[in-house]
Amino acid sequence: MVSVCQVERNDVENLNKELFYSYIKSNKPVVFEKYRSQAIEKWTPDYLLSIIGDREVHVNMCTFGSMSDIVPMKFSEYLNKTLKNEFPINDSNGERIKKINKPYLRNFGMLDEFPILKEDVKNNESIFNKDVHNMVVMGSFIGCKDSATNFHKDTGENLVSVIHGKKFIVLIAPSDETNIKSKLSHDIEVQFDSNDFGSPIELHPAFSDCSKIYTTILTQGQSLFIPVGWIHYVHNIDTTISVSCWGKEMIM
């Protein structure tokens, strides 16, 4: 049985660059429990609909697979179905749809297309030192209840902040990457609790050779720092809106 640990938590009131970069230097994930953003109060469903409306978006089924995983629909349709939990539970053959195949709005450039929304989360971007991370990219994510990503890693230091909802996140250090049985991690779902499908992470056969796994639950008003190269899995326990900010060191 693999050892499972909780991600460290820090309740600092005002996150500053010095503290943030100390975690980057140590290559260590951490939850900052007191994330402040205007978006937490402002981004109600009605507000987002008033800004974005019927704009066509491409909704992903997060297998990170082929283009057939992408379904076009109106933003208003996606958000309303998500809030009402109206997406199908079973496929056309009556089989239960896996979490990684449930709708997840993750490639919509909401913050770039609607600067008024980006203004609400600008403090995420400002935590990065542009002399070190000379490219900072921001993205927004809206996931329906029980949607999930597959296990993957990012190419930049990632600060993910929850605006609404709740996420269950699993993290694995780069030193354990070769110990992951990738096919099993895709074929057998990770179980969040006894009401969920799949295998509990500590008993999951895909990770039996890993030395340690970290988990956390990230809720509204909290941010998680995911160091570059760390493998992670994200399960939206509820309908969830979040923002990620990646700091990258690019050769100029």
Swiss-Prot record:
Q: Which domain of life is it from?
A: Eukaryota
UniProt-listed PANTHER family? HYPOXIA-INDUCIBLE FACTOR 1 ALPHA INHIBITOR-RELATED (PTHR12461), JMJC DOMAIN-CONTAINING PROTEIN A-RELATED (PTHR12461:SF103)
Q: Which residues form a coiled coil?
A: none
Checking Pfam families in the record gives: Cupin_8
User: Which terms does the record give in the GO molecular function aspect?
Assistant: 2-oxoglutarate-dependent dioxygenase activity
Known SUPFAM superfamilies for this protein? Answer: Clavaminate synthase-like
Transmembrane spans: none
Mind telling me which PROSITE patterns this protein's record contains? JMJC (PS51184)
Domain JmjC, by residue range, is 103-252
This chain's protein is named JmjC domain-containing protein A
Q: Source species, please? A: Dictyostelium discoideum (Social amoeba)
Taxonomy of the source species: Eukaryota, Amoebozoa, Evosea, Eumycetozoa, Dictyostelia
Q: Which Gene3D superfamilies match?
A: Cupin
